[in-house]
């Protein structure tokens, strides 16, 4: 070997030392002759590429260790990579697979779905150098080929492999199980390697301690592994930044998961937090005892864990592999006081985006502490009342129901000290003060300036600085521009005030926000021994709000800018006073012109009128329901605040609170309440006046007021204590109890972070972002007594304990929700439903009803009428009847089709009787009640043997019990699918039936979802310049979810209040999402809260009835006359024959593209596998496709294995009951089995025994056990009936079908492709498919539309261009063998503009593109698009002017 070669080997060994692998002996045979052939350093891009010559390709673990070691060792210098150059390039499948994870792992960062697909498999190797991977579909194949294939081959090449080729293998259905097993085995193999490493460490530890780690049964605290000593050093999770060999951490478990591996072992994975950070902990079971012990580790436990911290390639984060886990006593806050307090000011997650702890957790805490009562006081809402009531019952707490309201005075005065002075001739003294703060009591004036104005001219000026006697704060200097030098040595305040009082004389005093300036002046006058000013006063702020309510704000600088008034330096008294003077004169003139106001004592004549409530500044007050009357009054106030007085927030005028005061208790609330503000800003006298309105006074812990000190609104903690002591004195003097409340927004101090994230997400819109959030956790009695120790021990106990319980004792035990159902009453409803049912039955089945018909009717009517449900049927009948009269079919949803009375009253088209023939002429009938026929529609055509008339075919064989329960006492849930076009009409009709005051949209509450919370946390992490570990992000996300974000309305739910009650007996009322222009009001409570108390009608909007109506209009065919067993239509569900195209033409083996329920790729695959030929089999398909674990891994396997055929498998929930009864089981047991299976509860041993005793097949029993959710057969039958009708048009009237499909169901179009024909459409489809998983939602929706367009083109039809004079606004028009698209199919052209174009052309042809743009209100972009598409041929750009 040459010296140069030796040097290269030495360099390699030096490299191994630098990266910490000098002692790796396992791979010595691979490294001993290795050498660094060259190092390519790119200074510009800071990269180093090591070219290593080695005898043979490295084992994957060695390559990985070197790669990680180099990246870590040189991370501060350059990015590194290796190029292995082996002498021997022999490879095999084992080596290919060993490297696979390393090669594809980075792909997951770019495309998690493709990364997961590749990581969950191993490639196969085929000579000479081919690797093959499995994919599920074309999109996956295209994505891998285009984005990742070259990189995979390149990465193998860097590891020294010869040039590989790669191809994809499409999995068919039969291989899916094999693939899943393959992926599972692959994952377990990776975990096994990690487990082996853990076992080695555990073995060493056991040897060192001469003990064993066999786990004991859980008779005491949980423990796996060794006992961790009490004095062992605990590392904070927030201090773990890198891999560490052996450390101990502790924390609270907030998520657990146990995975059973095929090896028989278990993997325990849980997440813990110590509130400095969070971490994933993993542990593999060593034996069965460990595996059993894993089950005892629960969320909410505190544990101490010892193990090693390492980077986990699966989660791409630091995790701990645990060796020892010990349960420990958790960090628990106690309340040790003998006498307990009660919390009277507490927010739940229903305080919008402001409070985070659940009602249950807060109430549990109160109960654990031994408190006897707790109040709910969410911001303006009662939406947590139902949950709070339930939690109170659960934990034995008395619940006080209240709100923290936004109270307003009915009208804010414009003028004070009214005097009959002419406004046009008066002399005005316009002044402004600059102060050291907002409190007239604790702060002082540092500048006082004024100007005198008469007839719009300034005639005199006053200006003076005042020395405060102490340095100015930075805030004051920054806000006012006044410095210490400017005020130092100025006259003292008494001298300046005396001069100003003399100067202002008896003139009208004017200020912008006069209540503030006059408050300071009058308080200052009193301090220096002068009398308060009794001058007439005008407030320009309130006058501007009155005159210009539409302005966005009414700040001085905004108004002066609006009216071109010079304001040289805002927040300097002299400049503000002069600008205010000119503004005042402008306002005085406008007041005369707009409202004929001429005198000072007329300025308040309009106070409180119109939108005056919008101008009032809200302050907080707590309002509690003391009695049932008070609860109803509270509901009325909440309604009023949302319906009549909503402006940015719900507002309650003081006058309305006075009117509805009976049964209510009112408290002074927090720092935003008027009592605290009065004491802080105006002093004792003002506070004494304010407190007269309230029943009790609230004070809160000093930390709750911390933002006031931070913002310098309160000088310091000493000043805050003085304010609170004075409030206590005011209470004593007024004889009103002072209560210490917590203003609780979360349970524990550590929960503060969740609120911080939520408030941060709202940005500058939330004023709470102006300062650090206060500590507002739920405080124990001990903590509260400590907070108020500055009042003295006796007084602290009085406000914390005695008075809080005193207020609790004022309150009665209340129930905010009812126990019973209150349905509306319609006189004679019972007789009408009975008569309608029998009349229709006789009309169909003859005067002498068949026994099966009469028995079913009587059975149902007994339940319906006996339980008071007749009115529900009657209402539903009226709604459906009106829709039918107006020309729109109604589809039924859910299980209403299980009711024969619903069929007879025309609520549903589904007939639930056993399959039967029915003669429309002589009324003869023939029933098949032995289970031999699945649906009456499947019976062969037959003539009546009595009169020769063709039989009608009916009956879907559905038991009534699936609708109202076995006893017939379940509240009927009648869901009706109206046309989306007709839905608003149906909704409005309920107002006609019941009256507008008795029908409301069902309210919903939108809470922060996990995905949204994740965004909030990530934004917080970014804005705070933090790096948060994945497990900690999960914890923070969980803490932010479930908080109220908005309100809304159920898409079709209408709540009906009986006319013998009013809505306030059940719920307050509001507008959805605070949209005060909404046509409908909603229930304030989420409708689920009152679902069992009032009737809810589900009047839903659906495309199917809309499509049927359009098809009827186009064809003139009554959809009810369409046969349900048309042979060509049935062929559609198994082939493309009926369409006259080949499967390759439309890329589908069935013809169901665009058929509701049967057009998705998933259902089309089911059709291909099952090949249904009858209506009942289509119902089976519908049930199978909507259920959970009904098809996949269940019925699919049974059919594939030929265990049974499609008609025999369990498709819908009702099938179970019917089949079991036919098998001989007692009907009540059959019903119980059906209910248990459909709810995913499986079968009990007793159920299995009964089924086996009645010879139910074993496969049927096993199938029942797998099911998690099932679809009702009536729902499936109704859907299939609509689908078959629409399919009829597709087969026999294709252009009607396509025109309807594109009009009703499609939103996204590519008109360019569609107009240019089949090849253009296919090219666009390929473009979308080639994007694979990266295709957008809009592109995926377009793909569906293009599939239908392609099919239409394949059948010989075509699309025309949008036609300026033929196109409709929003419907596709048939023209010969083609369709003309509507205007709203043009990208970005909305329906309103489309209608405007149509309206404009009716008034005459367009003269030019310019004319189209002006009269049609069309944008230039749309004009350009239409021009490019050739829609505007012959139309000049501009109007032509002719002289002749």
Curated annotation (Swiss-Prot):
Pfam families: DNA_pol3_a_NI, DNA_pol3_a_NII, DNA_pol3_alpha, DNA_pol3_finger, HHH_6, PHP, RNase_T, tRNA_anti-codon
GO biological process: DNA-templated DNA replication
GO molecular function list: 3'-5' exonuclease activity; DNA binding; DNA-directed DNA polymerase activity
Keyword Kinase listed: no
Database matches in SUPFAM superfamilies: Nucleic acid-binding proteins, Ribonuclease H-like
Domain of life the protein comes from: Bacteria
Gene3D superfamilies, alphabetized: 1.10.150.870, 3.30.1900.20, 6.10.140.1510, Metal-dependent hydrolases, Nucleic acid-binding proteins, PolC, middle finger domain, Ribonuclease H-like superfamily/Ribonuclease H
Enzyme Commission (EC) number: 2.7.7.7
Localization annotation: Cytoplasm
Enzyme superclass (EC): transferase
Catalytic activity: DNA(n) + a 2'-deoxyribonucleoside 5'-triphosphate = DNA(n+1) + diphosphate
Ranges where the record places region Disordered: 196-218
Entry keyword Cytoplasm: yes
PANTHER family: DNA POLYMERASE III POLC-TYPE (PTHR32294:SF5), DNA POLYMERASE III SUBUNIT ALPHA (PTHR32294)
UniProt similarity note: Belongs to the DNA polymerase type-C family. PolC subfamily.
Protein purpose: Required for replicative DNA synthesis. This DNA polymerase also exhibits 3' to 5' exonuclease activity.
HAMAP family with a match to the protein in the record: DNApol_PolC
Protein known as: DNA polymerase III PolC-type
Annotated organism of origin: Listeria welshimeri serovar 6b (strain ATCC 35897 / DSM 20650 / CCUG 15529 / CIP 8149 / NCTC 11857 / SLCC 5334 / V8)
Gene expressing this chain: polC
């Amino acid at each position: 070997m040459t010296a140069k070669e030796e040097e290269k080997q030495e360099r390699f060994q030096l490299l191994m030392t630098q990266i910490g692998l000098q002692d790796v002996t396992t791979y010595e045979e691979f490294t001993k002759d290795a050498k660094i052939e060259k190092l390519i350093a790119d200074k510009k891009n800071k990269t180093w590429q090591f070219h290593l010559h080695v005898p043979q390709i490295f084992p994957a673990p060695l390559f990985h260790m070197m790669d990680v070691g180099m990246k870590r060792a040189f991370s501060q210098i350059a990015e590194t990579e290796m190029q292995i150059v082996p002498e021997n390039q022999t490879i095999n499948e084992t080596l290919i697979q060993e490297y696979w994870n390393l090669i594809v792992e980075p792909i997951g960062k770019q495309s998690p779905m493709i990364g997961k697909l590749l990581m969950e498999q191993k490639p196969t190797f085929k000579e000479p150098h081919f690797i093959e991977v499995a994919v599920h579909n074309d999109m996956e194949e295209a994505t891998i080929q285009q984005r990742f294939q070259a990189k995979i081959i390149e990465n193998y090449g860097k590891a020294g492999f010869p040039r590989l080729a790669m191809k994809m293998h499409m999995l068919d259905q039969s291989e899916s199980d094999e693939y899943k097993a393959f992926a599972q085995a692959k994952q377990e193999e990776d975990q096994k390697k990690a487990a082996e490493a853990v076992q080695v460490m555990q073995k060493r530890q056991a040897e060192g301690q001469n003990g064993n780690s066999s786990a004991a049964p859980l008779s005491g605290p949980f423990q796996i592994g060794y006992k961790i000593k009490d004095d062992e050093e605990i590392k904070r999770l927030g201090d773990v930044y890198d891999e560490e060999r052996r450390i101990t951490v502790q924390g609270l478990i907030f998520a657990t998961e146990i995975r059973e591996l095929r090896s028989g072992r278990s993997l325990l994975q849980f997440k813990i937090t110590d509130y400095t950070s969070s971490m994933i902990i993993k542990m593999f079971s060593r034996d069965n005892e460990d595996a059993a012990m894993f089950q005892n580790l629960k969320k909410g436990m505190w544990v101490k864990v010892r193990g090693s911290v390492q980077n986990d390639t699966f989660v791409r984060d630091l995790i701990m592999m645990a060796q020892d886990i010990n349960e420990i006593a958790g960090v628990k806050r106690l309340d040790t006081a003998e006498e307990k307090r009660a919390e009277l000011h507490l927010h739940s997650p229903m305080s919008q985006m402001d409070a985070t702890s659940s009602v249950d957790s807060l109430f549990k805490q109160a109960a654990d502490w031994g408190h006897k009562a707790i109040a709910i006081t969410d911001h303006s809402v009662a939406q947590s009342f139902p949950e709070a009531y339930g939690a109170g019952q659960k934990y034995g707490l008395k619940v006080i129901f209240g709100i923290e309201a936004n109270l307003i005075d009915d009208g804010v005065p414009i003028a004070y000290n009214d005097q009959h002075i002419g406004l046009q001739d008066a002399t005005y003294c316009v002044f402004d003060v600059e102060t050291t703060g907002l409190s007239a009591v604790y702060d002082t004036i540092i500048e006082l300036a004024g100007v005198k104005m008469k007839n719009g001219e300034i005639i005199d000026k006053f200006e003076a600085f005042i020395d405060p006697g102490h340095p100015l704060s930075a805030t004051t200097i920054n806000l006012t521009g006044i410095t210490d030098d400017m005020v130092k040595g100025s006259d003292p305040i008494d001298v300046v005030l005396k001069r100003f009082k003399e100067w202002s004389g008896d003139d009208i005093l004017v200020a912008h926000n006069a209540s503030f300036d006059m408050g300071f002046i009058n308080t200052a006058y009193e301090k220096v021994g002068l009398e308060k000013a009794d001058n007439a006063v005008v407030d320009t702020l309130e006058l501007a709000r009155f005159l210009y309510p539409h302005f966005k704000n009414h700040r001085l600088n905004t108004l002066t800018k609006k009216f071109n008034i010079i304001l040289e330096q805002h927040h300097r008294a002299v400049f503000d006073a002069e600008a205010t003077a000119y503004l005042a004169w402008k306002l005085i003139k406008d007041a005369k012109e707009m409202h004929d106001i001429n005198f000072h004592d007329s300025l308040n004549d309009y106070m409180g009128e119109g939108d005056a409530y919008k101008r009032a500044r809200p302050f907080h007050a707590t309002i509690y329901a003391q009695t049932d009357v008070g609860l109803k009054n509270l509901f009325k106030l909440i309604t009023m605040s949302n319906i009549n007085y909503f402006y940015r927030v719900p507002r309650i005028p003081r006058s309305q609170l006075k009117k509805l005061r009976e049964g209510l208790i009112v408290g002074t609330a927090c720092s935003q309440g008027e009592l605290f503000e009065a004491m802080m800003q105006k002093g004792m006298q003002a506070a004494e006046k304010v407190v007269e309105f309230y029943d009790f006074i609230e004070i809160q812990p000093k930390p709750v007021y911390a933002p006031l000190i931070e913002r310098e609104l309160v000088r310091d903690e000493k000043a805050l204590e003085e304010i609170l002591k004075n409030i206590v004195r005011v209470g004593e003097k007024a004889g009103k109890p002072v209560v210490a409340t917590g203003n609780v927004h979360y349970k524990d101090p550590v929960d503060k972070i969740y609120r911080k994230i939520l408030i941060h997400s709202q940005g500058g819109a939330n004023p709470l972002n102006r300062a650090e959030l206060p500590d507002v956790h739920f405080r124990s009695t001990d903590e509260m007594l400590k907070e108020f120790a500055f009042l003295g021990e006796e007084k602290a106990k009085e406000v914390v304990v005695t008075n809080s319980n005193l207020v609790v004792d004022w309150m009665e035990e209340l129930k905010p929700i009812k126990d019973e159902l209150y349905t509306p009453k319609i006189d004679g409803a019972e007789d009408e439903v009975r008569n309608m049912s029998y009349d229709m039955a006789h009309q169909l089945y003859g005067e002498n009803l068949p026994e099966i018909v009469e028995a079913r009717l009587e059975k149902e009517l007994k339940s319906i009428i006996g339980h008071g449900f007749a009115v529900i049927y009657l209402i539903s009948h009226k709604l459906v009847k009106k829709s039918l009269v107006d020309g729109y079919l109604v589809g039924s949803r859910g299980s209403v089709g299980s009711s024969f009375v619903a069929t007879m009253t025309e609520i549903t088209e589904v007939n639930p009787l056993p399959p039967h023939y029915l003669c429309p002429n002589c009324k003869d009938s023939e029933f098949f009640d032995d289970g031999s026929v699945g649906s009456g529609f499947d019976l062969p055509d037959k003539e009546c043997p009595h009169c020769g008339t063709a039989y009608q075919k009916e009956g879907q064989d559905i038991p009534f019990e699936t609708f109202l329960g076995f006893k017939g006492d379940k509240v009927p849930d009648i869901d009706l699918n109206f046309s989306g076009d007709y839905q608003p009409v149906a909704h409005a009709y309920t107002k006609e039936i019941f009256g507008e005051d008795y029908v409301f949209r069902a309210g919903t509450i939108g809470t922060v979802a996990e995905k949204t919370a994740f965004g909030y946390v990530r934004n917080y992490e970014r804005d705070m310049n933090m790096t948060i570990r994945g497990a900690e992000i999960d914890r923070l996300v969980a803490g932010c979810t479930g908080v109220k974000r908005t309100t809304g309305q159920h898409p079709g739910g209408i709540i009906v209040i009986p006319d013998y009650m009013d809505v306030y007996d059940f719920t307050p009322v509001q507008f959805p999402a605070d949209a005060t222009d909404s046509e409908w009001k909603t229930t304030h409570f989420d409708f689920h809260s009152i679902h069992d108390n009032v009737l809810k009608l589900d009047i839903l909007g659906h495309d199917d009835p809309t499509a049927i109506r359009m098809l009827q209009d186009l064809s003139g065919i009554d959809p009810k006359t369409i046969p349900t067993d048309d042979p060509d239509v049935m062929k559609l569900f198994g082939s493309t024959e009926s369409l006259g195209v080949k499967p390759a033409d439309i890329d589908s083996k069935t013809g169901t593209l665009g058929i509701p329920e049967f057009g998705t790729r998933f259902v089309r695959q089911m059709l291909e596998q099952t090949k249904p030929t009858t209506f009942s089999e289509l119902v089976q398909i519908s049930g199978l496709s909507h259920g959970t674990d009904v098809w996949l891994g269940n019925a699919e396997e049974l059919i594939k294995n030929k265990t049974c055929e499609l008609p025999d498998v369990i498709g819908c929930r009702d099938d179970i009951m019917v089949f079991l009864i036919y098998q001989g089981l007692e009907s009540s047991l059959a019903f119980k089995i059906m209910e248990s299976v459909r709810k995913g509860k499986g079968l009990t041993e007793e159920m299995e025994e009964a089924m086996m005793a009645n010879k139910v097949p074993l496969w049927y029993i096993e199938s029942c056990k797998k099911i998690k959710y099932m679809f009702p057969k009536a729902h499936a039958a109704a859907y299939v009936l609509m689908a078959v009708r629409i399919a009829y048009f597709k087969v026999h009237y294709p252009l009607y079908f396509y025109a309807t499909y594109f009009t009703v169901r499609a939103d996204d179009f590519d008109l360019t492709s569609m107009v240019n024909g089949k090849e253009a459409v296919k090219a666009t489809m390929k473009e979308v498919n080639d994007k694979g998983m990266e295709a957008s939602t809009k592109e995926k929706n377009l793909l569906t539309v293009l599939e239908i367009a392609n099919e239409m083109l394949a059948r010989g039809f075509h699309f025309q261009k949008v036609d300026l004079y033929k196109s409709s606004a929003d419907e596709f028009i048939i023209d010969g063998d083609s369709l003309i698209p509507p205007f709203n199919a043009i990208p970005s052209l909305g329906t309103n503009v489309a209608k405007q174009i149509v309206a404009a052309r009716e008034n005459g042809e367009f003269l030019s593109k310019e004319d189209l743009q002006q009269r049609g209100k069309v944008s230039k972009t749309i004009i350009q698009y239409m021009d490019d598409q050739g829609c505007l041929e012959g139309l000049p750009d501009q109007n032509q002017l002719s002289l002749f």
